[in-house]
Design a protein with these regions (language model features):
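Long, amphipathic, charge-rich alpha-helical segments that form helical bundles/coiled-coils
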Residues: 98-112, 154
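Juxtamembrane amphipathic/hinge helix adjacent to a transmembrane helix
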Residues: 106, 114-148
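Alpha-helix boundary/capping detector
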Residues: 78, 130, 156, 160-163, ...
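Juxtamembrane interface at the cytosolic side of transmembrane helices
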Residues: 163-181
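Juxtamembrane/start-of-transmembrane alpha-helix segments at the extracytoplasmic/lumenal side
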Residues: 141-161
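Inter-heme linker and motif-flanking segments adjacent to c-type heme-binding CXXCH motifs
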Residues: 1-75, 79-82, 86-96, 110-121, ...
Length: 181
């Protein structure tokens, strides 16, 4: 749904109409449109909700809950992206999980738009799929990094075996040269 559609179905729509104020202007201002951020849901200075809702009120609690959902999804996405980028930097093939992780970024964008419905259930419908994708991508990244460590250990062991064989051959050649004299 579009932000305006979500807002028109929200409880805030009716209240703002009764107050005679345009819905968007209450949170986003009228002429000096504020840059949007997740902080608009917080209880801090940049909060759009704190102007009308105390942190302990139902509206304040909903804003905190919605912010928590957004932060969880954003953190999950960033954590998965970081582990996949580490694996990619190490030379491992992670293009498919990185591509799939784009779904989590899309879910984050949709979740931020779903805030305009002021309904945790609507927000959760966007957040949950993104969390699943992020968790799956993170697990694949960790598995890839584990595989990298396995490969490195295998390389070290095979290098030691080859070194031992080379040293053995050198010693055998010297031994044969001494006998030949």
């Amino acid at each position: 749904m579009v932000n305006a559609e979500l807002f028109s179905k929200s409880p805030h729509s009716k209240i703002f109409i009764q107050m005679g104020v345009p819905g968007c202007a209450v949170c986003h201002s009228n002429h000096a449109i504020f840059e949007t951020s997740d902080a608009m849901l917080s209880a801090g200075d940049k909060s759009a909700c704190a102007a009308c809702h105390a942190p302990t009120s139902a509206g304040g609690a909903l804003a905190a809950s919605m912010l928590g959902s957004i932060v969880r999804l954003k953190s999950g996405y960033e954590k998965a992206l970081a582990v996949l980028k580490n694996a990619e930097h190490a030379g491992m093939e992670v293009s498919q999980p990185l591509f799939e992780l784009n779904e989590a970024k899309t879910a984050l964008i949709k979740a931020r738009a779903a805030i305009h419905g002021f309904d945790q259930a609507i927000l959760d419908k966007e957040v949950e799929p993104g969390l699943k994708v992020s968790d799956k991508a993170y697990a694949r990244g960790v598995k890839t990094l584990d595989e990298l460590q396995y490969r490195r250990k295998g390389l070290a062991i095979s290098a030691l075996i080859i070194l031992a064989l080379v040293v053995g051959l050198i010693l055998k050649i010297r031994q044969m040269e001494r006998k030949a004299k």
